[in-house]
Amino acid sequence: MRILLMTDWMTPIRDALNTALPDHDIVTAEPEKLSDAIAQANVLIPARNPITTVELQQGTNLQLIQQFGAGVDAVDLESAAAMGIPVANVPSGPSDLAKAVAEFALFHMIGAGRRFATLQQALAKQSVQTPFGASVFEARVCIIGVGGVGSALARLLQAFDCD
């Protein structure tokens, strides 16, 4: 089976899949060679690439589109269904993906609030005079959606006494 990772930043994932699935051909493709690679692939792992009717029609051997995360919004689900190509994702619950994404969101909340880039420059110059930015502690936070990620983020924010 030929599995196409549609970006070149997935090299560590490709290497791990090659180890785990030695009987399969795990490949990546340069953007200008993507059409040819899709035509030869049995499985697409699109990551950030949109999968439209054009890509689906190129993939005459496609048996599965496996999204590299929870969202499948970049995949033309109607066209895939019409062509009999199943689309799968990584559910946030069983894989702990929600926890990882929530942790990343919290990192960005703290970093943005504390103006991390500016703080990092000041620390490098040893010129920190006063606390930078705003604290997440006791902040009022609005979480849009309480699915796997939103729920995990809410649990993390409890430790910061957030509203």
Predicted regions and their residues:
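N-terminal glycine-/charge-rich "phosphate-binding" loop or analogous flexible N-terminal tail
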Residues: 1-41, 161
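Short beta->alpha connector loops
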Residues: 8-11, 30-32, 47-51, 69-72, ...
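Short gly/ser/thr-rich secondary-structure transition/capping motifs
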Residues: 24-30, 45-47, 121-129
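Acidic, amphipathic alpha-helical patches
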Residues: 34, 52-55, 132
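A short, aliphatic-rich alpha-helical micro-motif
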Residues: 37-38, 56-59, 136
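Residues at the C-terminal ends
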Residues: 39, 80-82, 159
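Phosphate/diphosphate ligand-binding glycine-rich loop within oxidoreductases
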Residues: 43-120
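Rossmann-like dinucleotide/phosphate-binding beta-alpha-beta segment
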Residues: 130-163
